[in-house]
């Protein structure tokens, strides 16, 4: 029995394992339940009982050596057959780093500011969280005006008094603050975010950017207003842009008008964006209402002025032929990278 164990140990030590097939052959020959080592274990019952423990220990040691040989060979084969670590090709270009740029809304707003700055306007700003008196009362809004309803306005505190606190629905309150703080002549633009409780769609959003303008001086007429808007539109949209003024109504201006430009998609022929009219509205405007001037302590018998307001986001849609305003708020890099610095 001892000679059989010694002979099998030498055979195991000399067995060459260099492939998965050879490893499997080794396992089947020596370590499985019907292998040679298991066969020797089955012969223990014929060994002298006095020597049986000694022979049993020798077989256990042989079995452990064979199993260790299997594990060692398996690890060695795994290392040699695993894919090689990828090498770095130093001649290849590195990963591209994209240069940051202005958001299209900020880009267009900057252009608008520059155009009006060249006309002599200065920039004025104010709080986005506004008092109801500045947002409505001083701008000649009647108490029952629909804009005061919660369906149109985000109220932070509402008790039906001048102390209502809300997210401003336009940047006109900045004009009120300017008229209260400065003496005429006044020539300012008021850019900023505004908030309205509107359904989100391709053409409207609950938060957007607005730019309003105010000019007060002696002898200001509607002709001055039209000249300013014509000059702005041609610099912003191109010298061939067509404009039209439509009579309208705003509580804070009289007379009032809405300004349209030819549709950027169809060129005035009619499409779904312009609702087959060929025109797109870009702003509202008019002569400052005498009541607004009186509320700010300015004598309308001496001074006159005009005001206008437009959505910056809508101007972005017009300028870059974007058909969905929601794209401006989704932070989709595929869209934003189309507007390089």
Swiss-Prot record:
Single GO molecular function: magnesium ion binding
The record ties this protein, via InterPro entries, to: aa-tRNA-synth_II, aa-tRNA-synth_II/BPL/LPL, Phe-tRNA-synth_IIc_asu, Phe-tRNA_ligase_II_N, Phe_tRNA_ligase_alpha1_bac, Phenylalanyl-tRNA_Synthase, tRNA-bd_arm
Quote the Pfam families the UniProt record gives: Phe_tRNA-synt_N, tRNA-synt_2d
Q: Does the keyword Hydrolase apply?
A: no
Q: Which Gene3D superfamilies match?
A: Bira Bifunctional Protein, Domain 2
Cofactor binding summary note: Binds 2 magnesium ions per tetramer.
Which Gene Ontology BP annotations are present?
A: phenylalanyl-tRNA aminoacylation
Q: Using the UniProt record, name the top-level EC class of this enzyme in a single word.
A: ligase
Q: Show the catalytic activity.
A: tRNA(Phe) + L-phenylalanine + ATP = L-phenylalanyl-tRNA(Phe) + AMP + diphosphate + H(+)
Q: Which CDD domains match?
A: PheRS_alpha_core
Q: What is its main location?
A: cytoplasm
Note the superkingdom of the native organism. Answer: Bacteria
From the Swiss-Prot or TrEMBL record, state where the protein is found: Cytoplasm
Q: Does the keyword Signal apply?
A: no
Q: Which UniProt keywords apply?
A: Aminoacyl-tRNA synthetase, ATP-binding, Cytoplasm, Ligase, Magnesium, Metal-binding, Nucleotide-binding, Protein biosynthesis
E.C. number, please?
Answer: 6.1.1.20
Cofactor list: Mg(2+)
Positions binding Mg(2+) in this chain are: 254
Annotated SUPFAM superfamilies: Class II aaRS and biotin synthetases (SSF55681), tRNA-binding arm (SSF46589)
> What is annotated about its quaternary structure and interactions?
Tetramer of two alpha and two beta subunits.
Q: Would you identify the family this protein belongs to, as annotated?
A: Belongs to the class-II aminoacyl-tRNA synthetase family. Phe-tRNA synthetase alpha subunit type 1 subfamily.
Q: What name has this protein been given in UniProt?
A: Phenylalanine--tRNA ligase alpha subunit
Which source organism? Answer: Chlorobium luteolum (strain DSM 273 / BCRC 81028 / 2530)
């Amino acid at each position: 029995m001892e000679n059989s164990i010694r002979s099998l140990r030498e055979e195991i030590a000399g067995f060459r394992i260099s492939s998965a097939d050879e490893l499997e052959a080794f396992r089947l020959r020596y370590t499985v339940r019907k292998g040679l080592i298991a066969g020797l274990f089955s012969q223990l019952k014929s060994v002298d009982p006095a020597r049986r423990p000694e022979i049993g220990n020798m077989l256990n040691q042989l079995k452990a050596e064979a199993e260790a040989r299997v594990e060692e060979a398996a690890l060695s084969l795994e290392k040699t057959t695993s894919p090689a670590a990828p090498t770095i090709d130093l001649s290849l270009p590195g990963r591209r780093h994209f240069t940051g740029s202005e958001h299209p809304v900020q880009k267009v707003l900057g252009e608008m500011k520059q155009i009006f700055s060249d006309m002599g306007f200065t920039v004025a700003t104010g709080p986005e969280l506004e008092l109801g008196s500045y947002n409505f009362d001083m701008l000649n809004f009647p108490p029952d005006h629909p804009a005061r309803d919660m369906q149109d306005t985000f109220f932070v505190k509402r008790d039906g008094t001048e102390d209502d606190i809300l997210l401003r629905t336009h940047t006109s309150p900045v004009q009120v603050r300017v008229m209260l703080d400065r003496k005429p002549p006044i020539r300012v633009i008021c850019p900023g975010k505004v908030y309205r409780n509107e359904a989100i769609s391709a053409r409207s959003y609950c938060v957007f950017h607005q730019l309003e303008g105010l000019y007060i001086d002696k002898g200001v007429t509607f002709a001055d207003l039209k000249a300013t808007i014509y000059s702005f539109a041609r610099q912003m949209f191109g010298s061939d842009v067509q404009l039209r003024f439509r009579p309208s109504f705003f509580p804070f201006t009289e007379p009032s008008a809405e300004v349209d430009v030819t549709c950027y998609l169809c060129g005035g022929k009619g499409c779904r964006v312009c609702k087959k009219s060929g025109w797109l509205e870009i702003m509202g405007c008019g002569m400052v209402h005498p009541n607004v001037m009186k509320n700010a302590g300015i004598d309308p018998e001496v001074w006159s002025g005009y005001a206008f307001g437009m959505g910056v986001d809508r101007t972005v849609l017009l300028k870059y032929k974007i058909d969905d305003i929601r794209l401006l708020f989704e932070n989709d890099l595929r869209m934003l990278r189309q507007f390089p610095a």
